[in-house]
């Protein structure tokens, strides 16, 4: 596989990828009606992950992916780069929030418009390509477009993102259509937990351990042809330093294979993030450079650079005798047995590796609306708390739109991802939402809905601790609680 190079830095205009405007269709004179903001940009020049994935999904569902001719055959579900650029020139996403009030039902329509110049649009599409959400038909590993007429398809990761976006917004039939286009027998894309304020990845040594098991598998397989969904591992024998007549077997991997696996099979969104995560595998001594003269703690995917599994890495994978292959059970059993169900769940949600396994379990069993509600309220809590402390009027209006979105998605009578709440709490939230366009000042209304959403989050956490957690522990042989 050819060596890959970091893409050139995005042009200064890239930060203008966004006139991100929200307008409400009610009470044209109300200050809730309109707000605009620049998308937050990471230090690597990429919009924060939530905006980035929403923008990608909106672009995809607004573009006609159809049957296109390529050389002497046809490619299904494809489009050209030119089509995507045309879509991005005038892209908007409309969401309708229905709020019951004393005067009947009100409709709050939120329209998000993205104003993106063509130069920035091309740069953005290249970022989608690097994130492995898109791929070029004749060169899936490419990280730059050859020309504007090149033919593109969604990757398995791209289909997963769009399907989840549609499901979140209540378009279940469309979500199923997108979900049906990728191989469900393949492993799920590994989710990545992030700090909402910085978009930085939540990670520790256990997160690295989980990724190592996902990359290489708990079953000892050597050679590239065994399992194409794992990083290829090659067996290399060399003379033992202690006895020249005996040989030592090492397990070799190439940096480019590790890099491609991380970008294609996890929700990492740029190659600098991938380098940081992969470097942690070196820092925590799961892998080591083949050549000790290399910089020991800096991961590289340059051509020819390879790594060996360390003894710690081999033991973590369970490739040695007398080691339990179920590392998840071992991690769950590290939780203190005297803990309550809720304390155990809170511990799982704090540990990146256990959180990933638990969220995947919920999704697999079609009950992930509780997890998504929990995560949305966490994000709302962080954003509104900061807006309230700094008295940022634009951020407060954004918090209003966010609160309405949470209500419409999880708590309204026709919510596509309804969560189960106590009837009295549900009634309190519904009654307060009815005053959404009436209470002044806006900050006063938000403070109360903030409290109610935190109460709802606690109720959902209790629900997961009493039901989903027990099933998760039972399935994985965890604590018998």
Swiss-Prot record:
This protein's UniProt keywords: Cytoplasm, Nucleus, Pheromone response, Stress response
- The RGS domain covers 344-474
The entry's cellular-component GO terms read: cytoplasm; cytosol; nucleus
Domain of life assignment: Eukaryota
Q: Which residues form a coiled coil?
A: none
Q: Which Pfam families match?
A: RGS (PF00615)
The GO biological-process annotations, alphabetized, read as:
negative regulation of pheromone-dependent signal transduction involved in conjugation with cellular fusion; pheromone response MAPK cascade
Boundaries of each DEP domain copy? 232-312
Question: GO molecular function: any one?
Answer: GTPase activator activity
PROSITE patterns to which the protein is assigned, alphabetical: DEP, RGS
Localization, UniProt: Nucleus; Cytoplasm
Region (Disordered) spans which residues?
A: 1-31
Gene3D superfamilies reported in the protein's UniProt record: Regulator of G-protein Signalling 4, domain 2
- What causes induction of this gene? By nitrogen starvation and pheromone.
Q: Does the keyword Nuclease apply?
A: no
Q: Where is this region: Fungal-DR?
A: 33-227
Q: What is its main location?
A: nucleus
Q: What does this protein do?
A: Negatively regulates pheromone signaling during mating. Acts in a negative feedback loop that is essential for the mating process. This loop acts to down-regulate cellular sensitivity to pheromone. Activated by ste11.
Q: Copy the domain comment.
A: The fungal-differentiation regulator (Fungal-DR) domain is only found in fungal regulator of G-protein signaling (RGS) proteins that regulate differentiation pathways. It is required for function.
Protein name according to UniProt? Regulator of G-protein signaling 1
């Amino acid at each position: 596989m050819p060596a890959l190079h970091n893409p050139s830095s995005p042009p200064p205009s890239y930060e203008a990828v966004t006139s991100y405007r929200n307008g409400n269709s009610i009470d044209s004179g109300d200050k809730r009606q309109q707000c605009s903001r620049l998308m937050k940009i990471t230090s690597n020049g990429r919009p924060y992950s939530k905006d980035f994935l929403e923008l990608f999904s909106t672009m995809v569902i607004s573009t006609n992916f159809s049957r296109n001719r390529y050389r002497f055959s046809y490619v299904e579900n494809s489009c050209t780069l030119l089509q995507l650029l045309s879509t991005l020139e005038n892209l908007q996403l409309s969401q309708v929030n229905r709020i019951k009030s004393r005067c009947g039902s009100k409709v709050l329509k939120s329209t998000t418009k993205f104003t993106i110049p063509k130069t920035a649009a091309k740069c953005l599409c290249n970022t989608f390509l690097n994130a492995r959400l898109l791929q070029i038909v004749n060169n899936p590993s490419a990280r730059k477009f050859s020309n504007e007429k090149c033919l593109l398809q969604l990757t398995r990761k791209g289909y997963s993102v769009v399907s989840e976006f549609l499901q979140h917004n209540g378009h279940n039939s469309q979500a199923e259509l997108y979900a049906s286009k990728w191989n469900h027998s393949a492993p799920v894309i590994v989710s990545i937990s992030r700090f909402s304020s910085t978009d930085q990845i939540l990670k520790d040594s256990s997160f690295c351990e989980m990724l190592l098991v996902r990359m290489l598998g708990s079953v000892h397989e050597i050679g590239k042809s065994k399992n194409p969904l794992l990083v290829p591992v090659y067996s290399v024998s060399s003379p033992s330093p202690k006895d020249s007549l005996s040989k030592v077997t090492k397990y070799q991997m190439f940096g480019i294979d590790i890099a491609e696996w991380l970008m294609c099979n996890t929700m990492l969104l740029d190659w600098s993030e991938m380098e940081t995560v992969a470097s942690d595998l070196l820092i925590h001594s799961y892998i080591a450079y083949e050549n000790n003269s290399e910089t020991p703690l800096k991961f590289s995917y340059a051509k020819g650079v390879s790594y060996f599994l360390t003894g710690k890495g081999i033991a973590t994978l369970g490739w040695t005798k007398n080691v339990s292959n179920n590392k998840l059970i071992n991690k769950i059993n590290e939780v203190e047995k005297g803990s309550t169900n809720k304390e155990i769940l809170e511990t799982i949600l704090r540990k990146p590796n256990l959180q990933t396994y638990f969220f995947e379990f919920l999704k697999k069993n079609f009950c992930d609306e509780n997890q998504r509600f929990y995560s949305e309220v966490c994000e709302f809590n962080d954003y509104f708390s900061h807006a309230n402390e700094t008295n940022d009027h634009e951020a407060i209006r954004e918090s209003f739109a966010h609160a309405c979105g949470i209500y419409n998605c999880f708590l309204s009578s026709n919510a596509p991802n309804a969560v189960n709440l106590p009837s009295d709490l549900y009634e309190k939230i519904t009654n307060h939402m009815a005053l959404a366009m009436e209470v002044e000042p806006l900050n006063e209304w938000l403070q109360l809905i903030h409290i109610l959403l935190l109460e709802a989050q606690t109720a959902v956490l209790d629900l997961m601790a009493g039901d989903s957690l027990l099933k998760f522990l039972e399935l994985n042989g965890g604590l018998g609680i």
